[in-house]
């Protein structure tokens, strides 16, 4: 089965599915061998492994070089963390074209301004993109893709920016209508109340993905109860590897 089809089926599944982060060919292979059905190509982790910050200091072509090694090393699908799409709608078109060439199954883009700001920076400004402009990126990506199963996930940062539930729903619906295959709803609270409030209003309009980095103590059964489709463990492999390298080096 094609990697794109595998990812599409995961997103459309009635069961909660999981992606684990990887940032190199080796880490991607480890994730697959651990039994994960898909991989999150984390922008933070890839940037960190290259020794740069998570704000587009690494170029998109440098990120794609790493993703190609990851794709070649594995048989499971990879969803790329595409930040803001690395520019405007033209950049998005070229990004999708290149991702398909290296057998990446999908891309997630967030509704922020390029260059992106990490969502968890303390007291950091979180300017959001214009809704119409971001919808244009989604449409551009869907128009250029050749594989019908290639997935575009729209990441909503309204909660991160402090704009509330109403804005989150407004943006998610606009992105769904623009053609997004799924919505990633992000939150920086230490509990999942914003996510669950959103799900109660959203219903089943489109599949929802989450990144429970901050609310990691929430039982996964609660995600199932709220009909969440995909949970992404976004940087666990990278953080764990840093700790082990530090321990070995200090010995």
Task: Show which residues each predicted segment covers.
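Alpha/beta enzyme core
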Residues: 2-229, 233, 240-246
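Short, intrinsically disordered, charge-balanced linker/junction segments flanking boundaries
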Residues: 249-251
């Amino acid at each position: 089965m094609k990697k794109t089809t595998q990812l599409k089926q995961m997103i459309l599944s009635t069961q909660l599915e999981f992606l684990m982060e990887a940032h190199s060919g080796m880490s991607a292979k480890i994730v697959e061998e651990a039994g994960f059905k898909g991989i999150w190509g984390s922008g933070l982790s890839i940037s960190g492994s290259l020794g740069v910050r998570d704000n587009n200091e690494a170029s998109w072509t440098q990120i794609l070089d790493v993703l190609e090694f990851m794709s070649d090393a594995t048989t499971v699908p990879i969803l790329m963390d595409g930040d803001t799409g690395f520019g405007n709608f033209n950049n998005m078109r070229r990004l999708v074209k290149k991702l398909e060439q290296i057998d990446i199954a999908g891309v997630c883009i967030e509704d922020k301004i390029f260059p992106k700001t990490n969502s968890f920076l303390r007291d950091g400004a979180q300017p959001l993109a214009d809704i119409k402009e971001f919808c244009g990126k989604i449409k551009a990506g869907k128009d250029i893709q050749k594989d019908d199963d290639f997935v575009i996930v729209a990441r909503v940062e309204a909660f991160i920016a402090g704009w509330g539930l109403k804005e989150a729903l407004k943006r998610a619906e606009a992105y769904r209508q623009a053609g997004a295959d799924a919505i990633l709803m992000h939150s920086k609270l230490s509990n999942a109340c914003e996510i669950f409030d959103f799900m109660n209003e959203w219903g089943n309009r489109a599949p929802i993905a989450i990144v429970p980095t901050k609310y990691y103590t929430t039982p996964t059964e609660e995600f199932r109860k709220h009909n969440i489709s995909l949970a992404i463990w976004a940087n666990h492999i990278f953080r764990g590897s840093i700790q082990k390298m530090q321990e070995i080096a200090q010995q």
